[in-house]
C-alpha cells in the first residue's frame, strides 16, 4: 500500500535549502519516492485553524517500509540536522489506501 510523508514546515532561514534539496531529492528517488506536492504557494484551509507554517511537502512512497527506510537512511541524518538550522518541521507518515 502506498504511504505519504507529509511535512509541515515553519522556515525562518532558508539558506540550508539548496544543499538539502539536492541531497534529499536523490534519497527520495533511491527509496522509490516521488514528490506529490512541494509548495510555498497559498493553500486553503477548509475547516479548523490554519497551521503556523510556511511550506508543505508531500512525498509518496510505495509502502510505509520504503518511507521509513528513507527517513532512517544514514545519508539523511546530516540533512535533517542541516534543515533544523533554519526550520521547524512536523512530519507525518500516513498509510494510503489501495
Where are these regions (language model features)?
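Conserved, structured core segments of small domains
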Residues: 1-98
Amino acid at each position: 500500500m502506498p504511504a505519504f510523508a507529509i511535512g509541515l514546515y515553519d522556515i525562518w532561514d532558508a539558506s540550508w535549502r539548496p544543499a538539502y534539496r539536492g541531497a534529499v531529492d536523490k534519497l527520495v528517488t533511491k527509496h522509490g519516492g516521488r514528490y506529490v506536492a512541494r509548495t510555498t504557494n497559498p493553500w486553503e484551509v477548509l475547516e479548523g485553524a490554519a497551521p503556523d507554517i510556511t511550506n508543505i511537502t508531500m512525498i509518496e512512497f510505495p509502502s510505509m517500509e520504503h518511507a521509513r527506510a528513507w527517513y532512517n537512511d544514514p545519508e539523511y541524518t546530516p540533512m535533517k540536522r542541516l534543515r533544523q538550522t533554519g526550520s521547524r518541521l512536523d512530519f507525518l507518515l500516513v498509510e494510503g489506501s489501495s
